[in-house]
Amino acid sequence: MRFMAGPAGSQNPGPMCFHSSLQALYTVLLIVLVMMSLVFGKFVPVNWERPQPLPVPKYLRCYRCLLETKELGCLLGSDTCLTPAGSSCITLHIKNGSNSDVMVSDCRSKEQMSDCSHTQTSPVSGFWMFSQCCFLGFLQ
């Protein structure tokens, strides 16, 4: 077995070695970027201003599904629809006495908003329907 004398013998190539080589790599990269900036004369200033807030969307995006159950998810027609300001998204729950729940989701225009948030009996005996809307207050 060989033993090394002097400072080389006390170095242990481990995590510190990796850290120092990574730090050296970052230093070289920084020097190269500064030199390129000086040679080519292009300097990209850093924008320290706070970013402007995103504009309020003009449309409300609603989930649309023609037949959905909690157990199986959407079975028919899964996509999204856009509805203009003043309109809403609606989910119609159709339930029976055994707590089975079938849902229909869609967009609702201003004229159809009377359907929102009320319960009614279904034309089919033993079932009832509950509609639930969500809307967003749009800025004009």
Swiss-Prot record:
The keyword Kinase does not apply. Residues 1-41 form the signal peptide. InterPro entries: LY6_UPA_recep-like (IPR016054), LY6G5C (IPR026110). Disulfide bonds join C62-C89, C65-C74, C81-C107, C116-C133. Its main location: secreted. It is found in: Secreted. Forms oligomers. CDD domains: TFP_LU_ECD_Ly6G5c. This is Lymphocyte antigen 6 complex locus protein G5c.
